[in-house]
């Protein structure tokens, strides 16, 4: 077994080679984001963005990858933080890289490991030793990106959820609406903490009357499920700038369980190939969905700090 110090040294060397020191210079424009204005809503101290990715062509995509974005670096992401006011974050392994989590782990080191966590992708038969190593490297969950071809399947949830619960990690789930309907009983039976990406992709039209929404509401009532108020554009039919149909779903989630909502920018918005959204507007929409300062702070600070193991104060 490789000593822990050696593993850390390897990660540190990889990070130093890939990314120069992150600049603190003010930026007006953000790569992979429309607009230049700051949001009207003011982020509370210690605000956490629970969903963003980095991409780098020096890391080969997995065979069959369907999303192949241009490079999006930690430096680029810092510009987004300066624009919207967040200071902490959770880096999500994209489907592009399969189970090769090196880039997201190195990005965490470049951004500052005390203020960032990682959600990884692993094989269904991942050894316990690898999970422990990933835990040391800041990983706090596994993503089941089931709407895209990948190493994990719906059946993998049943296999891995108990193991992740032992680590106090999250099962981060990205499912199509029909998958949620078809697997409602399985989802209800899973142990541990479930986090649904992108408003759980509640379909439009239909929204609050749809079966997937009602299933997610049932999971919220169970008490071990969180919803990520991210990617309104994934399911919206009404579209920008307000994504009113998806926004109605988001506001209903907040009203039902404000203590189990988190937010993510989804930068660099890999699914939006023609026109990138305005991240400042998306942040202002979150404030509208929250309906008040107390819920806004819960969503951005209190809830994600508890879920991913950050300091609750942001200090």
Question: Where does each model-flagged region fall?
Answer:
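Mid-to-C-terminal alpha-helical segments outside catalytic/metal-binding sites
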Residues: 2-21, 28-46, 71-88, 258-260, ...
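Alpha-helical packing segments of well-folded alpha/beta enzyme cores
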Residues: 76-80, 100, 160, 179, ...
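Catalytic pocket-lining loop regions of alpha/beta-barrel enzymes
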Residues: 151-263, 314
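Active-site beta-loop-alpha junctions enriched in small/polar residues
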Residues: 53, 94-95, 121-125, 145-147, ...
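A short acidic, helix-capping loop that chelates divalent metal ions and anchors anionic groups
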Residues: 58-63, 203-205, 235-238, 271-272
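Active-site phosphate/pyrophosphate- and oxyanion-stabilizing loops and adjacent acidic/basic residues
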Residues: 78, 105-106, 184, 217, ...
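Mid-domain alpha/beta scaffold segments of enzyme catalytic cores
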Residues: 28-163, 167, 244
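Short, electropositive alpha-helical surface patch
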Residues: 101-116, 249-254, 278-287
